[in-house]
Curated annotation (Swiss-Prot):
Composed of two chains; the small (or glutamine) chain promotes the hydrolysis of glutamine to ammonia, which is used by the large (or ammonia) chain to synthesize carbamoyl phosphate. Tetramer of heterodimers (alpha,beta)4. Residues 1-169 are annotated as: CPSase. GO terms for biological process: 'de novo' pyrimidine nucleobase biosynthetic process; 'de novo' UMP biosynthetic process; glutamine metabolic process; L-arginine biosynthetic process. InterPro entries: Anth_synth/Amidotransfase, CarbamoylP_synth_ssu, CarbamoylP_synth_ssu_N, CarbP_synth_ssu_N_sf, Class_I_gatase-like, CPSase_GATase1, GATASE. This is Carbamoyl phosphate synthase small chain. The gene is carA.
Length: 362
């Protein structure tokens, strides 16, 4: 393949080498600071509609394997790398990154200065961008880019359309799919949970009819304020069933209890974000992927901040003062990234036990 252009909304143009699928795309450009884990990132549906830049200088060197998918159908718009490894060496490798992107109809660009690109995003914030093959009129592409309105139904696009089971012999968990990563299912499977995955717009009564022991609110893409039906569902189940929210689930849980959210300048996307547990001072290194956060302004009395990001002090976790419910902004399931916070799945199951014991004693 030949040359390919990356055109930013602010007018900046990068020229590089095309790889992956042969098509033009427009999306929100973001960056990920992880040194590995590109397969998990590309298949993470939280990147729905986004052009994903990897800051690490070499990507693709261990190929793509069958084990590390976070979704069967990746929904990111494009991939930007400094260097795409033309040869991949790993005993699990099934195909190269280039072959994988072609098979999933995702275009890529390599050979550009991703450090310079990342500095632009950090300074100006995330913005629209276009990946286009050389030869197209730049003026026409820029006009199209300016005129493009990015969709807001990201969660609707990636959520399952019908409920499905992930059988187990332990606790019954209803997992509300806002764009879930398969690693969340794997964490529950390790703990022998019987999981039912349901669409994002499932009602509170429909969830209660499944007789769950606990409810998990998954990660997902976009703006949490775009799914008001999820807020209504959360209000209808909290206090009746223990709740655990991750990433998008954290934001929705907070909104449902009267908090507000805001769009971050360039978000948290990487696997090395240090988070402090306020009560103990414990530091966990966490995997994160989000462009919105819960605001400290006017945080309702019902929510107690439990975790914060060390660098920017953004809220990384809350728990409800009166109900058996808590949430975190980061990914305790990792995939990719450190497993420092995987204990939160155990704490959720312990919360379920305590709730059921208290309920039985009344």
């Amino acid at each position: 393949m030949g040359k390919r252009l990356l055109i930013l909304e602010d007018g900046t143009i990068f020229e590089g080498q095309a790889f992956g699928a042969d098509l033009d795309v427009t999306g929100e450009i973001v960056f990920n600071t992880g040194m590995t884990g590109y397969q998990e990132s590309i298949t993470d549906q939280s990147y729905n509609g986004q052009i994903l830049t990897f800051t690490y200088p070499l990507v693709g060197n261990y190929g793509i394997n069958r084990d590390d998918y976070e979704s069967i159908k990746p929904t990111c718009k494009g991939v930007v790398v400094s260097e795409n490894a033309r040869r991949a060496n790993n005993w699990r490798k099934q195909m190269t990154l280039d072959e994988f992107l072609k098979s999933k109809n995702i275009p890529g660009i390599s050979g550009i200065d991703t450090r310079a690109l990342t500095k632009i995003i950090r300074h100006h914030g995330t913005m629209k961008a276009t990946l286009a093959n050389e030869g197209d009129s730049i003026e026409h592409l820029q006009d199209q880019l300016r005129a493009t309105v990015l969709p807001t139904n990201n969660i609707e696009q990636v959520s399952t359309k019908t409920a499905y089971p992930a059988p187990g012999v332990g606790k019954n968990i209803v997992l509300v799919d806002f764009g879930l990563k398969h690693s969340i299912l794997r964490e529950f499977s390790k703990r022998n949970c019987n999981v039912t995955v349901v669409p994002y717009n499932t009602t509170a009564q429909e969830i209660l009819n499944l007789n769950p022991d606990g409810i998990m609110l998954s990660n997902g893409p976009g703006n949490p304020q775009d799914v008001p039906e999820a807020l209504e569902m959360i209000r209808g189940v909290q206090g009746k069933i223990p709740i655990f929210g991750i990433c998008m689930g954290h934001q929705l849980f907070s909104l449902a209890n009267g908090a507000s959210t805001y769009k971050m300048k360039f978000g948290h996307r990487g696997f090395n974000h240090a988070v402090r547990e306020i009560a103990t001072g414990r530091i966990d290194f966490t995997s994160q992927n989000h462009g919105y956060a819960v605001s400290r302004d006017n945080l309702p009395e019902e929510l107690i901040i439990t975790h914060e990001e060390i660098n920017d002090k953004s809220i990384e976790g809350v728990r409800h003062r009166y109900y058996p419910a808590f949430s975190v902004q980061y990914h305790p399931d990792a995939a990719p990234g450190p497993h420092d916070a995987s204990y939160l799945f155990d704490e959720f199951l312990e919360l379920i036990d305590a709730f059921q014991l208290e309920k039985a004693s009344k």
